[in-house]
Amino acid sequence: EAPCGDTSGFEQVRLADLPPEATDTYELIEKGGPYPYPEDGTVFENREGILPDCAEGYYHEYTVKTPSGDDRGARRFVVGDGGEYFYTEDHYESFRLTIVN
């Protein structure tokens, strides 16, 4: 599926330049799990309106573990059905388009 919407306005970051836990999460997503949290893989509704406006169910969210702390923390990947990976480290307040290859 082709990516939905215009992503040209997003800051880009290479996967290798993110915390190592981001690579761990990316590899789990590419394998289809298993995921450490039941919320992983659920639909991300884009209520904040920051990501391109796509059909309901287009985006899914995944936890990027935070080394300290027992909760899920604030880091996530939001992945589009077209293969876009958006990284947030502030719980959806901002996103960077992640270059995964």
UniProtKB/Swiss-Prot annotation:
Which keywords belong to this entry?
A: Disulfide bond, Endonuclease, Hydrolase, Lyase, Nuclease
Q: Which Gene3D superfamilies match?
A: Microbial ribonucleases
Name the active site residues: 61, 91
| A molecular-function term among this protein's GO annotations | lyase activity
What name does this protein carry? Answer: Guanyl-specific ribonuclease St
| Classification via InterPro entries | N1-like, Ribonuclease/ribotoxin
Q: What is its EC number?
A: 4.6.1.24
Record-stated family: Belongs to the ribonuclease N1/T1 family.
| Entry keyword annotation includes Cell inner membrane | no
The enzyme class is lyase
Record's catalysed reaction(s) = [RNA] containing guanosine + H2O = an [RNA fragment]-3'-guanosine-3'-phosphate + a 5'-hydroxy-ribonucleotide-3'-[RNA fragment]
Q: What is the lineage of its organism?
A: Bacteria, Bacillati, Actinomycetota, Actinomycetes, Pseudonocardiales
Disulfide bridges in this chain: 4-54
